[in-house]
């Protein structure tokens, strides 16, 4: 049975690819947690926590597209399952990576993820990181290689140009392998930006 969002009456089914619905429904029923869809957060796409009541809650940002939302949801379910099976272990350690790979297997299908994302996703899952944003190619593919309205990816900004990020001005500098050196105009320190950061 599909679980509506608490107090909102909306269903999560509109947030994921249609062919993924039965698999997600099974995971929600099997692992007994509340799924809460929340407003965009700057620092994370989702999280898993045990509430003071002892119940488990997973939150996922409402601004993600269906493919990002599904991946984030399964990422957080993997934290929950890892907690159930192994107790307190490293948040993105080997136990979590193994559980995450296992939970993602049913979703690695061309009727759920487009082919251009599937190969990148399979590669990412071989050694998943805390955030899909750390894998630049996967992150860009999940976003459809399109930045949010009114923003640009840092790699699209011209060398030497000044841009704003979190209300601070930076000047784009040289590229180091996968990241760009950017000078904070206020404190004159150099920071490294992943090339998929939106500014």
Regions inferred by a protein language model and the residue ranges of each:
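Metalloprotease/metallohydrolase-associated module, dominated by Zn2+-dependent proteases
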Residues: 3-51, 57-58, 63, 87-199
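Conserved strand-to-helix beginnings and helix N-cap segments that scaffold or border functional pockets
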Residues: 70-71, 93
